[in-house]
Regions:
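N-terminal secretory signal peptides that target proteins for export/translocation
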Residues: 1-8
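Low-complexity, glycine/serine/threonine/alanine-rich intrinsically disordered linker
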Residues: 28-50, 68-75, 79-84, 88-821
């Protein structure tokens, strides 16, 4: 060491001067405790000469105002703390030296992070994201107006689309907000007398046949019995379109009942029950909405599983826009099996009738109209047409406007309206009146101004502890993705919401509401990336059994599983492994589990030898962590490290090419990665990435269990796998799957079951990850260094209950992370 001193002295002195010149207020002299560790174990590789990994510790300053600088210091701390640095082949630092240096650095990072939070808050001044904006208008005005497509998509950070630091505001946003507010206000304004709620039953074969006559005639037929038989729903959106019906009152809710069944035709007729040969699988009936054009894609899909044993009645409820109608189509019928005589083809969906009820409403005028115009009378614009173009009428326009605006602004701004608020919006109302606008038009202009103002678009939070109104907004956005309701605002007015017992009770109330489903969807969309379930389309040759209904069932499975964990306060161990799954018949069939019938999800005990259980073996998770053609242990490994363990890997170097899958089956992904890992620059990261990815290799891109890879043959005739009931050949069985691997710490596993056990040995890591993901979603800010202490406290506090999910949620909401800006 003495012999090295002259060579090391210049950089040691530079390091000392640099550290001393950037002292934190945390604990004077804390950097002196880093110098011995850096000098003895770090500078050999990380000085100005070597600079391995691009890191020069000899010139690295301390700058609390620079987020990138603090992230780099945090990375240094984590690498040393996790014993990844120094490298395994290097001498280990003495325990007391390592402990002292880490304690000093951890304290400095915590102090400066906490000071920033006290000064500026954890969450930057943020706006409502797209879903929050749409839900808020829907709940405020009571109209399910189609606004989602009007607004730009939100960027994400840490997987979530409500993170304030990522939510920009552009001129496009402002233009779209004006359009959306105008559309929502007009839709909420009543202009007709109460519509008649009617129930109509239509002969489906007649209405459908008239609309689709001469189109895709090999896809459908009207049987001699008068039923409509549909053979293939995949050729175009007009298959099954109820073309003779349109909503008598657009943009209201309607309930559709469809009587249908799966059936087999025999010699041009529907086979009698005694002659029915049961189809090898049920047919899925899809109900959706579509526009008048045959090119209109259906949306708002709902699926029902039809049995061949008897007719069933299937219900679908939706808000129907103008120019839209019902769309019915069967799934799981092979389109390539079509023949010129459809009634001789066999398996089909038979529709007897469709019943339509609506419009459905609780009161008239609806609640949204009453919020805007109170109990003002509706009078016709033209007395000669007493039931057309009704308008709210006021004898005292100024007084009524002031009364109505105060109530509206209090709901829209999520706090009582100030006198300045009232003055600004009344001024616009009076200006519109002077310009000759009608009362309702003038009032809507003021409402539109409110819905495009910062008080509506942005969260009103100040550094420090949130006031009760800000707390009400944060709680409702967290669990409902919407504005607080009247009860939350009433408690905020009383100053009672911030009391721990009241806050807990309100958390329970919000979770019990149907609107809490938004929490399930948005949280899982960010945490597990389920919002990207549609981003890939599995290759139809390799995965011909994949279909929209299977995908919807996968998504519903994960959502129902999360809701079960939350409702029953089950342990976060279930994230990795559970002894049950939420299944319907289609999913059970896909997973190879017997005894499940029907399209409704229910809790199903898993067989002892099942490889399923937990989020990581669910179809939706396995689909979003793969592309449409192949699985990648690297991609899935990164997914598990980030989403399940909370240790996201660093992004790959820009000069490292991605691996292209060999869909011909000549080379396995393990063989490709072995060559890739032999490169020194790649080995370190892959030691962490590859094990969890290979543990999941027995699951293909659609979540099916496999023991071999599917491959596409050079010649189609060489394919050995057929679609049932057809002559279509798709793929061959390729090389065998090998899911075994060894973790970076030396622990080995043979398959997913063994890997799960290794993860379950450290449930506190699973809990910590869930707490960090919850805090990001609930507050709109990704984890910061000062949050680590709070997260550790929450994990410790919930350990006696085995880290129950509901306990974790309550603990986050009652913590400084949630209660402070």
């Amino acid at each position: 060491m003495i012999r090295r001193l002259p060579r090391l002295a210049p950089r040691w002195l530079a390091l000392a001067l640099l550290l001393l010149g950037s002292e934190s207020a945390a604990a004077p002299g804390w950097r002196a405790r880093l110098e011995p560790l850096f000098e003895a174990h770090c500078l050999t590789c990380h000085d100005a000469d070597e600079k391995k990994g691009g890191l020069d510790l000899a010139s690295l300053a301390w700058n609390p105002a620079d987020a990138g600088n603090q992230q780099l210091w945090t990375k240094i701390l984590d690498l040393v703390e996790q014993d990844e640095m120094p490298p395994k082949r290097k001498p280990r630092p003495p325990a007391d030296l390592r402990h002292g240096a880490l304690t000093a650095l951890r304290g400095a990072l915590h102090h400066d992070s906490l000071e920033r939070q006290k000064r500026d808050g954890r969450v930057v001044f943020r706006r409502l994201n797209r879903a929050e904006y749409v839900n808020t208008l829907h709940d405020l005005l009571g109209k399910d107006t189609a606004l989602q497509g009007l607004l730009p998509q939100d960027p994400t950070a840490g997987g979530f689309d409500n993170i304030g630091a990522a939510l920009n505001l552009s001129t496009e946003h402002l233009e779209r907000y004006l359009q959306a507010a105008d559309s929502a206000l007009k839709a909420a304004t009543v202009t007709t007398p109460p519509p008649t709620r009617a129930k109509t039953r239509l002969d489906y074969s007649e209405t459908w046949h008239d609309w689709n006559h001469g189109f895709q005639t090999t896809s459908w037929a009207v049987s001699p019995e008068g039923f409509l038989a549909i053979y293939w729903g995949g050729g175009g959106p007009s298959h099954g379109t109820l073309g003779a019906w349109s909503p008598p009152v657009p943009d209201e809710r309607y309930r559709f009942r469809v009587r249908a069944r799966a059936m087999i035709t025999k010699e041009g007729h529907l086979a009698k029950p005694a002659d029915q040969a049961r189809p090898d699988r049920n047919i899925i009936l899809k109900l959706a909405l579509t526009g008048e054009s045959r090119a209109s894609a259906p949306y708002g899909e709902a699926f029902h599983e039809m049995s061949p044993s008897e007719f069933g009645e299937f219900t679908y409820e939706a808000t129907v826009p103008e120019g839209h109608t019902l769309y019915v189509a069967p799934h799981r019928i092979v389109p390539a099996a079509a023949k010129e005589k459809p009634m001789e083809r066999g398996l089909c969906a038979v529709v007897e009738w469709v019943e339509i009820e609506g419009p459905l409403y609780e009161a008239w005028p609806p609640a949204g109209h009453r919020l805007l115009y109170g109990d003002l009378p509706l009078v016709p614009e033209n007395p000669a047409e007493p039931e057309k173009n009704l308008r709210p009428y006021s004898r005292q326009p100024d007084a009524d406007a002031a009364r109505l605006l105060r109530g509206f602004l209090g709901r829209a701004f999520r706090r009582p309206a100030t006198e300045q608020d009232m003055a600004e919006h009344l001024a616009l109302f009076r200006e519109q009146q002077r310009a000759g606008r009608r009362f309702d038009e003038s009032l809507r202009a003021s409402y539109k101004l409110a819905l495009c103002s910062p008080a509506f678009l942005f969260l009103q939070e100040k550094p420090g502890r949130l006031d009760d109104f800000a707390l009400a907004t944060r709680l409702s956005l967290a669990l409902w993705s919407s504005a607080p309701d009247e009860e939350l605002l009433r408690l905020a007015t009383q100053g009672a919401l911030s009391k721990p017992a009241t806050l807990r009770a309100q958390t329970e109330r919000l979770l019990a509401s149907p609107k809490a489903r938004r929490f399930t969807q948005t949280f899982l969309g960010g945490w597990l990336n389920l919002r990207e379930i549609d981003f890939t389309q599995p290759d139809t040759k390799l995965y011909p059994e994949f279909e929209p209904y299977l995908q919807q069932s996968m998504l519903r499975e994960s959502e129902a599983f999360f809701e079960t964990l939350l409702r029953d306060n089950l342990s976060v161990r279930n994230v990795v492994h559970s002894d049950f799954a939420m299944l319907n018949e289609r999913l059970a069939e896909h997973y190879g589990i017997t005894g499940v019938k029907g399209d409704h999800l229910r809790r199903v005990p898993l067989p002892a030898d099942s490889h399923r259980g937990g989020f990581i073996t669910q179809g939706a998770v396995l689909k979003v962590s793969a592309n449409g053609t192949s699985t990648s242990p690297v991609v899935r490994g990164a997914y598990v490290l980030d989403r399940i363990l909370g240790t996201p890997p660093a992004p790959p170097p820009k000069d490292v090419p991605s691996l292209e899958p060999d869909i011909r089956g000549a080379t396995t992904i393990r063989e490709q990665l072995t060559q890739h890992r032999d490169q020194p620059a790649c080995a370190g990261c892959h030691a962490k990435l590859d094990p969890p990815g290979f543990a999941l290799e027995n699951f293909d891109v659609i979540g099916r269990w496999r023991t071999s890879y599917r491959a596409i043959p050079e010649k189609a005739k060489d394919a050995i796998v057929k679609i049932p009931g057809t002559d279509i050949r798709h793929y061959i069985d390729g090389p065998a799957v090998d899911p075994s691997y060894t973790l970076a710490d030396g622990r080995a596993f043979r398959d997913i079951d063994g890997f799960k056990q290794l993860l379950l040995a450290h449930p506190e890591q699973l809990a910590r990850c869930v707490v960090e993901k919850l805090s990001a979603h609930l507050t709109g800010a990704t984890p910061q260094f000062a949050d680590r202490e709070v997260v550790t406290e929450i994990v410790a506090r919930t350990r006696p209950g085995d880290f129950g999910l509901r306990d974790l949620l309550h603990a986050v909401i009652q913590s400084r992370l949630f209660l402070h800006k």
